Design a protein with these regions (language model features):
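Nucleotidyltransferase catalytic core that binds NTPs
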Residues: 2-215
Length: 215
C-alpha cells in the first residue's frame, strides 16, 4: 500500500469521525472529538483545509469545511425499528455499502402512533439505541414528531449524499423525493433490495408469528 493511499484513508477516517461529532454536538470542541491518536488530528485537519476553527469564549470549536465534507459520502436511512429483525440488518448493511457513513433516523413514539394507530412495543430511545448498536450503523437519531419523520429538517441537519429506502417505504420515499425536488437538493435516492425470507421481512410479520407461537 502506498504512503499516499494510507494517508488518504487516515484522513477519511478522521473526517468521518469529525462529521459524526458535528452531527451530535454541532461545532465541537477537542474534548468532544473522541478519536484515539497520538498526534493532534484537529490541527492537521485545519491546516489541510478540511476543518474550520473558531474561538468561542475559552474554547476552540471546529466544523467541517466544504472540502472536508466532500471527501465522504453520507447515506441516510430511516424507519420505525419496533422489534429489530434480520431484514432490518440486511437492509442497513446494504445501505452502509453505498457510502462511508450511515445515519439512521428512528421514528418517535408520537410518529409511530400517528402512522400505525398504536404505541410502539419499545419506546423511542430504546429503539434508537438498539439501531445504533447494529454494526453497519454509525449513528442513529430520533426524527421529529410528524408523519414524515421531519425529513425536511433532517435533510438539512444530516446533508446526506444518498437517501436509502426499504422496499416497503413507498409513501415515505414519495414524501422525501418531493422535498428533494422542491428544494433542488443534490441527493441520490436508492431503493434497497427486498429481503429474501418473507417470514422475517417485516416487524409486523415477526410479531404475528410470535403471537401465534405464544397463543
Amino acid at each position: 500500500m502506498s504512503r499516499r493511499l494510507k494517508l488518504n484513508e487516515e484522513v477519511r477516517s478522521l473526517i468521518r469521525a469529525a462529521y459524526l461529532t458535528q452531527l451530535r454536538y454541532g461545532p465541537f470542541t477537542a474534548k468532544e472529538f473522541n478519536y484515539a491518536t497520538e498526534n493532534d488530528p484537529l490541527n492537521h485537519l485545519v491546516s489541510s483545509g478540511y476543518l474550520l476553527a473558531q474561538q468561542s469564549g475559552p474554547e476552540r470549536r471546529y466544523s467541517l469545511s466544504e472540502t472536508g465534507r466532500s471527501l465522504i459520502k453520507v447515506v441516510l436511512a430511516g424507519g420505525v425499528y419496533d422489534v429489530i429483525h434480520v431484514g432490518h440488518l440486511a437492509a442497513l448493511t446494504e445501505a452502509k455499502s453505498l457510502g462511508d457513513v450511515l445515519v439512521v433516523v428512528v421514528a418517535t413514539d408520537v410518529t409511530v402512533e400517528t402512522l400505525k394507530g398504536r404505541r410502539p412495543v419499545l419506546p423511542e430511545e430504546d429503539r434508537r439505541a438498539l439501531v445504533e448498536g447494529l454494526k453497519p450503523v454509525d449513528i442513529a437519531i430520533l426524527g421529529y414528531e410528524d408523519v414524515g419523520f421531519g425529513f425536511d429538517q433532517i435533510l438539512k441537519e444530516v446533508a446526506p449524499n444518498i437517501v436509502a429506502f426499504g422496499y416497503d417505504q413507498e409513501k415515505l420515499e414519495r414524501t422525501v423525493v418531493e422535498i428533494i425536488q422542491r428544494q433542488d437538493l443534490k441527493i441520490e435516492v436508492v431503493k434497497l433490495s427486498r429481503f429474501r425470507d418473507e417470514k422475517y421481512a417485516s416487524s409486523s410479520s415477526l410479531k404475528q408469528r410470535l403471537s401465534e407461537e405464544l397463543s
